[in-house]
Every structure is written in structure tokens, then in C-alpha cells.
């Protein structure tokens, strides 16, 4: 029952956030400076209610593989309103595990990175909404 309620909450949040309009949320216009590093939530914290589904864990694994890319991506859950400055910010805490939009965007960014797309090209796809086609249940199994 808790899993169903959490899943419905994620879906509801996604629907509400998508309706926010055409504003492009905050993102960084270039990569991290050499020597700088931003942490993804440590693996030993990937448990509990925020990590009940395989796609939640997989989203964090992918975020850890492409931190420089997601640092340059906007996040359409509009978390810039709570101080986030890019999609990367979502995966520095459990925020990304609670938000279907964040997870879809990180799966999309990873797929496009594997296709050798540049961060600029990936960002354009995110702004177009290409990430909306991601199915979290099926994509987690294929990565």
C-alpha cells in the first residue's frame, strides 16, 4: 500500500510540475571547473522509503556516472525555486528519488550521453520535453 501511495504521489507531482509553463529552470551553462567535484548522495544512503524501487537506485547510479552532464541540465520539477541550480542538485540528497521528473531526466541524459550527444544537445532535448517519453519501470531494467 505504501509503495502504491508513493508511486501515485510521484505521478501527481509530475503532472502538476509539467503544467508549470515554458519557463526554463536554472542550470549551469558549462562544466564544473577542473578540480571541482559535486557529490551525489552516497551509496550507503540509498535505502529506506526513498529507494523502494529499482529505478530509484538506478537513477542515482546513472547520476554518479554523468555528474558533469547533469550539472549542466535544468530540472523541470522547478526545484530551482528551493535553491537547486541544476539537475545535479536533485541527486545530492534524496530529492531525486522522490521525483519522477528528476529520475526521467537523468535516465534521458544518460541515454543521450551514451549516444555521444553533447551537454548542449541533451539540454535542448530536455527543454523540448524529450525526457517525458521515459518509462521508469522499463528503462531501469534495460540499463
Which residues are covered by each model-predicted region?
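Secretory/periplasmic and organellar redox-cofactor proteins
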Residues: 1-64, 110-143
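Short, thiol/selenol-centered motifs that function as redox-active sites or metal-ligating centers
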Residues: 73-82, 86-109
Amino acid at each position: 500500500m505504501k509503495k502504491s501511495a508513493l508511486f501515485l504521489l510521484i505521478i501527481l507531482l509530475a503532472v502538476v510540475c509539467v503544467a508549470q509553463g515554458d519557463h526554463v529552470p536554472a542550470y549551469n551553462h558549462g562544466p564544473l571547473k577542473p578540480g571541482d567535484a559535486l557529490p551525489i548522495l552516497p551509496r550507503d544512503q540509498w535505502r529506506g522509503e526513498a529507494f523502494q524501487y529499482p529505478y530509484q537506485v538506478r537513477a542515482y547510479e546513472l547520476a554518479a556516472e554523468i555528474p558533469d552532464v547533469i550539472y549542466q541540465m535544468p530540472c523541470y520539477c522547478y526545484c530551482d525555486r528551493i535553491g537547486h541550480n541544476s539537475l545535479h542538485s536533485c541527486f545530492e540528497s534524496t530529492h531525486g528519488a522522490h521525483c519522477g521528473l528528476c529520475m526521467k531526466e537523468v535516465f534521458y541524459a544518460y541515454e543521450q550521453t551514451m549516444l555521444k550527444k553533447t551537454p548542449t544537445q541533451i539540454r535542448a532535448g530536455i527543454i523540448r520535453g524529450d525526457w517525458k517519453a521515459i518509462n521508469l519501470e522499463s528503462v531501469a531494467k534495460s540499463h
